[in-house]
Structures are given as C-alpha cells and as structure tokens.
UniProtKB/Swiss-Prot annotation:
Organism per entry: Endomicrobium trichonymphae
Record gene name: serS
Protein name according to UniProt: Serine--tRNA ligase
Record's function text: Catalyzes the attachment of serine to tRNA(Ser). Is also able to aminoacylate tRNA(Sec) with serine, to form the misacylated tRNA L-seryl-tRNA(Sec), which will be further converted into selenocysteinyl-tRNA(Sec).
Pathway as given in its UniProt record: Aminoacyl-tRNA biosynthesis; selenocysteinyl-tRNA(Sec) biosynthesis; L-seryl-tRNA(Sec) from L-serine and tRNA(Sec): step 1/1
GO-annotated biological processes: selenocysteine biosynthetic process; seryl-tRNA aminoacylation
Length: 423
C-alpha cells in the first residue's frame, strides 16, 4: 500500500507512475477524503478540549460541594454526542481511504524501464547456451506421457483440465527437485519454513493478492479462507504487526508449497503440459530487509534463484520487467526465463521482486534501529527458487534423447537414485 503522504505531496509524480503502468487513476476523490479527514480530526480535537474543560469545571464544582448547572451538564452531553457522530464520520472516511489505497499498485523503481508490456522488458544477461539437437526435440508433455511419468487423462478425470498426475520416476523426479532446491538454498543461508496452505483474508490482503486478485484465487465456500497462490503469502505474514531488530535483518526464508491459482492459459500451447496449471509446486524465497539494503538483497536473490538452474545445467536468461509488465505489489522485478528445447523459446521460471515498503505498510512490519531506537517500515522481497513443475518440464525438454529417454542432471542423481528414465 502506498503512503498517502507520498500521494498528497507528489500527486503528479504518482499519477505518472500509474500511467507508466498503463493505469489512468484519478486521485481527486482520495485527496478530498484526506482533506475531509484532516478537518474532522481538527474538529474532534477541539471538541475534546471543550469537553475536558467542562469536565474540569464540573469536577471543581463537585469538589466544592456545589451542584453543576443543568446547562453545563446538558452542554457536556451535547459535546459528547457530537464527538461520537464525528468519530463515526471519521471511521467511514478512513475506510474509504483504505479501500482506495488497497487497490493502488506499487510505484515502479526509477531503474525500471518504462514500457507498455513484456515487449519492452530488458534482457540483462544470458547464462549457459542451449544445446543443439541432432533431432527435432519434443514438448515435455509428449515426452512425459510416452515415458509413463505424466498422466493428464487421469488428472482430468479426477479434477478437470489444467491438472497433472505424476507417476513412477516422474514422482521421484519431482520430489528430488524439491529436496535439491531446499538444500541448495539452505546452503546460502535461507531458513526452511513450512506454513499452512489455507490463509485468512488479512494474509491475502497483506501481500497484495486481495482485493484486486480475488477472482484469480480459490476461496473456501464456508470458511473465509483462501488456498495460497504462493508461499510468499503465509511466509511474509509471519511477521505481520511485528517489529524486528535491526541486527536481525536480513531474514531469509525458503519454503516449499503447493500453489493454487484459478488463472490458466486459454490459448496456444499453454493449454497443454505443466506450464500453467491450477495446482503446481514451487519453492519460494522470502526476505525481510532494511530499506537501505533492499536493492542489494534483490540482486543476491536473483543470483540465488539462478544458482540452482546453473547447477542443473539449464540455460536461462535474466530479464528486467518494464513498468507495463511488473506485478501489482512489485517496485522492481527480474524474471528468470529458462530455455525450453521443445518450445524453442525461453519461458519464465522465476520472478524475483523488491516490494520495498508496499507489503510492510499493509502488514505493519517494522524495523527498530539500535542507534536511535527509531522504528520504520522494513522492505520485503520474494522470488521463486524456483517453480518445480516448470523445472521438471525444462529437464524433460533439455535432457531428452533421440530414443525418447531422459537423462537426469548430474546434480540430481543422488536425490533420484537413477540417472536416466527410459521408455
């Protein structure tokens, strides 16, 4: 959530930042509410002063064993009623302000390229080179079904479209990928954490999924609970309404979870395979950092996510997203896009973002500095470390052999217990 003070003092700049996101937002109503709020607060303060003086006068008279005049008692009751009415109006206006601010996205960092959409993203670097095959490489779903390790028909029968059943060596490979990711990130200083898959509305609002993305979320019909779209939601919320000591930062967490999203590809090749499903597995990285170090923490987050891809021998590239492509809560995002030999293109496998104080303001997470005891909002960061299903798919496409078999990357073999999946 944005600081209303920033909007109040820099409304033209904030409006331009929204235009850079392809959003034409008028802040006139918000500023009117803000002005009205200030006026009401002033009235309440004056009325409280008046009430206090009248109460003191009543107290003085009673101390002198004198009966307070009926007019004075009536006046103090009248002031009390006016204060209560003004406080009700204040609550209504503050609710309007909060509802408005909850729907406004983060301001892009100055280093983010201004652009309309993904076509304006900036490629930062390539890591590794795609292998040239002596045969036409197949898509991962073709490979998986022929090997008997992916069963989309069974998943469709069980749940419907955009789900997958992994079997035999496929299940073992997925489990191996998850364990590999967790181990490698723990070696980098991340603390492993396991959280609930069901979270309340406050948690989803805190990270920015609600209210704007409610239609993309799976919600329980009876309880006011949501299936998590990413472990970012529960992990970031562990410090909601907390104050962290400066010496405790940065805090770095790694968490494996299943993820659930209603959105799904409706055209092209994304209607097949493991790229875009309602349920998928992901290892998530979350950081809590001091504002002055969050930019550095983002760069190291990108390196940590890329490290596991390099260890798996998967070629990828790092892309800086433009203002027209970054997510709602993000101030700056790098995508890691892995090479898919079957597709013949790079596809997103991780998004690493600096949210700055956007989530911290929604969740009231602060850092206390040791020198001056000052408390201020900290910065949160998160990134996939990385998407398990897409890694599974990338391994099938990049390590496929002409006979239909798939070689297991060297770094995974101690986790799988086998080095090849044969037809």
């Amino acid at each position: 959530m944005l600081d209303i003070k920033v909007i109040r003092e820099n409304v033209k700049e904030v409006k331009q930042a929204m235009l850079n996101r392809n959003l034409d937002i008028s802040f006139d109503q918000l500023l009117n509410w803000d002005s009205e709020r200030k006026t009401i607060i002033g009235k309440i303060e004056q009325l409280r002063l008046k009430r206090n003086k009248e109460s003191e006068e009543i107290g003085r008279l009673k101390k002198e064993s004198k009966e307070p005049p009926a007019e004075l008692l009536a006046e103090i009751n009248k002031v009390r009623d006016i204060i209560q009415e003004q406080e009700k109006q204040l609550l209504t206006i503050e609710k309007h302000i909060e509802d408005f601010l909850l729907r406004i996205p983060n301001i892009p960092d100055k280093s983010v390229p201004v652009g309309k959409d993904e076509k304006d993203n900036k490629i930062i670097r390539f890591v590794g080179k795609p292998e040239k095959f002596s045969f036409k490489p197949k898509y991962h779903w073709e490979i998986g079904e022929k090997l008997g390790i992916i069963d989309f028909a069974a998943a469709s029968k069980i749940s419907g479209p955009h789900f997958a059943v992994l079997k035999n060596e496929g299940s073992a490979l997925e489990r191996a990928i998850i364990s590999f990711f967790l181990d490698k990130h723990k070696e980098k200083g991340y603390k492993e954490i396991t959280t609930p898959y069901l979270v309340n509305r406050a948690s989803m609002t805190g990270t920015g999924q609600l209210p704007n993305l409610e239609e993309d979320s799976f919600k329980c019909a009876i309880d006011d609970l949501y299936l998590i779209p990413t472990a970012e939601v529960p992990v970031t919320n562990i410090y909601r309404d907390d104050v962290l000591e400066e010496s405790a930062l940065p805090q770095k967490y790694v968490s494996y979870s299943a993820c659930f999203r209603r959105e799904s590809g409706s055209y092209g090749k994304d209607t097949k395979g493991l790229i875009r499903n309602h349920q998928f597995d992901k290892v998530e990285l979350v950081k809590f950092a001091k504002p002055e170090t969050s930019s550095e923490e983002l760069e190291s987050l990108v390196l940590d996510a890329g490290n596991v891809l390099e260890l798996l021998g998967l070629p990828y590239r790092v892309v800086l997203l433009s203002t027209g492509d970054i997510g709602f809560s993000s101030s700056k995002t790098y995508d890691l896009e892995v090479w898919f030999a079957g597709y013949g293109i790079y596809r997103e496998i991780s998004s690493c973002s600096n949210l700055k104080d956007f989530q911290a303001r929604r969740m009231n997470i602060k850092v206390k500095y040791s020198q001056n005891k000052k408390r201020e909002l900290l910065h949160t960061l998160n990134g996939s470390g990385v998407a398990v299903g897409r890694t599974f798919a990338a391994i099938l496409e990049n390590y496929q052999q002409e006979d239909g078999s798939v070689v297991i990357p060297n770094s995974l073999r101690e986790y799988t217990g086998f080095d090849i999946i044969k037809p």
